[in-house]
C-alpha cells in the first residue's frame, strides 16, 4: 500500500511518499500550507495512496502544544476531503533536528528549502519501520 507522509508547517508542508511493503521512501516536495489540502488530495487520488501519515509536533515531554492543535485542525480538513483514506497522526518529535543533521554542510538557503521534505521522509521512515 502506498503511504504519504506530511510534515505540516504554517508556511510550507513537506511531503514524502512510500510503500508499506517495499519500505521505500521518496521525496514528494513541498507545497504552501494554503494549498496543502488540495495538493494532498490530488496526490492521494493520482497515486492511489491508502494512508496519510501526518507528523504531530509534541513537546519534548510528549504533551500537545499550540503547534499540535494547528496540525489537528489541518488533519480535520484532510479528513473532510479524504473520507475514505486512513489518516494517522505520528509523533514527530526530533524529526526537524534529524533533518538538519542530515542536511549538515549545505548552505543555509538549501537547508531551509529541503528541511520540510526531509522531515516528511523521516516521519515516513519511522512509520514504515514500525509496521
Swiss-Prot record:
Keywords: Cytoplasm, Hydrolase, Nuclease, Ribosome biogenesis. One of its GO terms (cellular component) is cytoplasm. SMART domains: YqgFc. It comes from the Bacteria. One of its GO terms (biological process) is rRNA 5'-end processing. It is found in: Cytoplasm. InterPro entries: RNaseH-like_sf (IPR012337), YqgF (IPR005227), YqgF/RNaseH-like_dom (IPR006641), YqgF/RNaseH-like_dom_sf (IPR037027). GO terms for molecular function: nuclease activity. Its EC number is 3.1.-.-. The keyword Hydrolase applies. Transmembrane segments: none annotated. It is an enzyme of class 3 (hydrolase). SUPFAM superfamilies: Ribonuclease H-like (SSF53098). Pfam families: RuvX. Could be a nuclease involved in processing of the 5'-end of pre-16S rRNA. PANTHER family: POLYNUCLEOTIDYL TRANSFERASE, RIBONUCLEASE H-LIKE SUPERFAMILY PROTEIN (PTHR33317:SF4). Belongs to the YqgF nuclease family. This is Putative pre-16S rRNA nuclease. It comes from Aquifex aeolicus (strain VF5).
Amino acid at each position: 500500500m502506498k503511504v504519504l507522509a506530511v510534515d505540516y508547517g504554517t508556511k510550507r508542508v513537506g511531503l514524502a511518499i512510500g510503500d508499506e511493503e517495499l519500505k521505500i521512501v521518496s521525496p514528494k516536495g513541498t507545497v504552501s500550507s494554503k494549498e496543502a489540502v488540495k495538493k494532498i488530495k490530488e496526490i492521494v487520488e493520482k497515486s492511489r495512496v491508502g494512508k496519510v501519515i501526518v507528523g504531530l509536533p509534541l513537546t519534548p515531554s510528549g504533551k500537545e502544544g499550540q503547534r499540535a492543535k494547528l496540525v489537528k485542525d489541518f488533519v480535520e480538513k484532510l479528513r473532510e476531503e479524504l473520507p475514505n483514506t486512513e489518516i494517522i497522526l505520528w509523533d514527530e518529535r526530533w524529526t526537524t533536528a534529524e533533518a538538519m543533521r542530515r542536511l549538515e554542510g549545505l548552505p543555509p538557503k538549501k537547508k531551509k528549502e529541503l528541511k520540510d521534505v526531509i522531515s516528511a521522509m523521516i516521519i515516513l521512515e519511522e512509520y514504515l519501520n514500525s509496521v
